[in-house]
């Protein structure tokens, strides 16, 4: 018999998300390496027990894009945490089945380097390729269950985006 998971009984995974913009205000989008279909997203990841959210954002950015802290400029932090629930087909299959979704603190950083300095072939590779895109295309390119999160994040940082 298949185990039934009550999502209400599970916590949200503490996480950060990074909106990385270039000089033109375009957003870094990475194609997920583990997806058989196009699934573009912004860098994101969990917050370690001993980390502050901003530290986690800078660590995740380096792990996923190869971009060190000295090549970005902090622009803004989202005023609130944003949550999303996993769809039923993923519940119990990701993060060891311990979480119902993610609770994310989003940060906006401006990239100060060149495209050649971005290196997604990292030890913790998340992306197979990347590109700079506008805010509306970013929202349209995310998997549907995360789209409301991206809509809120874009709205929070709108003044800085192309």
Curated annotation (Swiss-Prot):
User: Which residue ranges traverse the bilayer?
Assistant: none
* Function (record text): Accelerates the degradation of transcripts by removing pyrophosphate from the 5'-end of triphosphorylated RNA, leading to a more labile monophosphorylated state that can stimulate subsequent ribonuclease cleavage.
| Keyword match Hydrolase | yes
- Recorded family membership: Belongs to the Nudix hydrolase family. RppH subfamily.
Some GO term, biological process aspect, for this entry: which one? ribose phosphate metabolic process
GO: which molecular function terms?
A: bis(5'-adenosyl)-pentaphosphatase activity; guanosine-3',5'-bis(diphosphate) 3'-diphosphatase activity
Q: Organism source for this protein? A: Cereibacter sphaeroides (strain ATCC 17025 / ATH 2.4.3) (Rhodobacter sphaeroides)
Keyword Repeat in annotation = no
| Residue span, Nudix hydrolase domain | 11-155
Cofactor(s) annotated in UniProt: a divalent metal cation
Tell me the domain of life. Answer: Bacteria
Alphabetical list of InterPro entries matching this protein: Nudix_hydrolase, NUDIX_hydrolase-like_dom_sf, NUDIX_hydrolase_CS, NUDIX_hydrolase_dom, RppH
Q: Where is this motif: Nudix box?
A: 45-66
Q: Which PANTHER family match?
A: NUDIX HYDROLASE 26, CHLOROPLASTIC, UDP/ADP-SUGAR PYROPHOSPHATASE
Q: Which SUPFAM superfamilies match?
A: Nudix (SSF55811)
**Which Pfam family would be a valid example here?**
NUDIX
Q: What is its EC number?
A: 3.6.1.-
**The entry's keywords:** Hydrolase
Q: What is this protein called?
A: RNA pyrophosphohydrolase
